[in-house]
Amino acid sequence: MKKSIARHMAVLLLSILAIACQRRPLTTADYAVIVNLEIEKDIVNYEVEKDPSLMRCIFYDSNTGAFVTQAFLPPTGGQVSLIPAREYDVLVYNFDTESTWLEDENWYHTIYASTSLIPDSFKTKLRSRASKTDDEQIVYDPDHLYVGRLNDVFIPSRSVDAPAVVLDIKCETVVESWLLEVKTITGAKNIGSMAAVVTSLAGSNKIAYDERSAEYVSVYFDNQVIDQDGVLTAKFNTFGWTDRITEPQVLSLVFTDVAGKGHVFNIDVSDQFIDNPEQIIRINVEIDIPEPMTSGDGGFVPKVDEWDEINTDIII
């Protein structure tokens, strides 16, 4: 009897060992994800000369909006490792901008893009745009920021030999490129330098929602060119305009002549930001920069900082 019991116990132990030694798929709470990226290059008034050099891919907890993990990928995408199993909101953007800054990056609901203020020395040169207050926020125009989003993406616990989870994400810019055309500038030979400011444009963009802020800034740019026909052209970038901004959009053209005198022309362009798919601001007026007085004219030539700057409001 005892031998029979022992024999049965031995068989039972061998059966347990056989079961324990069977190969089973391993599961893990962390799992790699393949992210495929596509950059939308069809942008009004802007030619994408090359792909971004680096993309940041952030996984946020979709319930709390809190940062969980991230990876830095080439513009075509790649693998993101060690993704804990849960539901995510995924946000991707290019990480190679010079003038566009990202803030509050640890929370999906608050992350936003903005740009930096111009130096006080530049702002002083624009002081004669007298209708603006000392606390006016004048910023550089932003670089294009390509943003992609996926919401409520569930990453399960899976066996290590299961097929990869693949996410396809398209990234589109949250920045607009606008053109400026002014006809006509006379006295171009008398211009030493020129710059421009457009007021009351969105100061930032909540990139998780592509939401323009109602807090506005003035955008500074200085890439104007005047051709032989006296046509001034320029390009500037902006986070755009929203109807939540009730202040007018005023273009200030700021010229400094070769003697150092400032000439400022203010033009209300509010109507041109509404229903304008071309994103071109056209100004059909003649602006004259007169030849500055010289000592040979028998007049007194003041120092640069003694000149009064000239303000002109142009009605179009």
Label the predicted regions.
Residues M1-A10:
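Bacterial N-terminal signal peptides that target proteins for export
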Residues L17-A20:
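C-terminal motif of bacterial Sec signal peptides marking the signal peptidase cleavage site
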Residues Q22-P25:
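Bacterial signal peptide processing site
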Residues D30-V48, V182-G187:
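Short amphipathic, basic-aromatic surface patches that mediate peripheral association
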Residues L54-E105, H109, N190-F273:
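Tryptophan-paired
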Residues F67-E172:
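Short, low-hydrophobicity acidic/polar segments
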Residues Q137-D227:
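A sequence/structural signal for flexible, mid-protein segments enriched
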Residues R244-I316:
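Hydrophilic extracytoplasmic domains
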